[in-house]
Amino acid sequence: SINSEKFSYDVIGQLGINEKSSIFSANNLERAGYERRWGKSQSFIKSVGIDQDQDILKTKISPQSDIITEIVSGANRLKDEKIIEAALGDVQGGKEGLASDTPRLIRGSSLHTIAHGGTSITLAKLIAIRERFAQQEIPESTKKIVVLSAKQESALFGISQYNSFDFNHTKPLATGVISEFMGLTLVRSEKLTKTGSNRNCIAFAAGSLMLATGRSRKTDISVRKDKQGFPLQIYFEENYGALRISEQGVIKVECTES
């Protein structure tokens, strides 16, 4: 959790292990490598008014629960958007997170980008995702997620191996469900950005991105006595910030999309 507009996260670098050369030899004490990363927390609010004569009579006796459900759904979509921004955006580093500190970049890196090649999502791109994660020594046990748009999700059905029961323990054509393939968890989001005719899909290893929450979620239903008709007010507020904490675990997957 976070309690300010700016928050930091200390990342520990990879640590190797040394061969024991002899008995009773002195320990070679090494300092673990730390890297501090900085994120920004923001507050997001929604306030909805309900006229107790007009709105309630026209819709239903108690629309409050449905409105709250819609507000929470909108809040979750915004969280997805912020996580996607953090996945491919610049990350400020340094002890104090000053503007003069060199930001950590991911864009333009061939190691962390799979070029579109004029195609949508393909078997070759999925294989490349697995290969990049392996090159970065991401453990096999770590969950790996690929975020696709609806059109890219549809393109999966054109991959024969994806639809074959020999390669996939589910039946995508029968169920219409995109879940897992080649050890990758496939999820859909319409918040992925687009550059020209290419959709910037994202693959990431669990633990490479974080969503830090600030103050506890506020929800309140009250009567606004300062307004004519004493309408009900539904108020919602959340505070959070997203941050990429590892370049090694994030890959931009460019996919052509008309």
PLM regions and their residue ranges:
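Short, solvent-exposed loop/turn elements at domain surfaces
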Residues: G16-K20
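Short, catalytically relevant binding-site loops at active-site mouths
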Residues: G89, K151-A155, L192-K194
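Oligomerization/assembly interface segments of phage tail-like spikes and tubes
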Residues: S43-V48, T69-I71, L232-I234
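Structured, hydrophobic secondary-structure cores that serve as assembly/anchoring elements
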Residues: Q14, Y34-P63, L126-I159
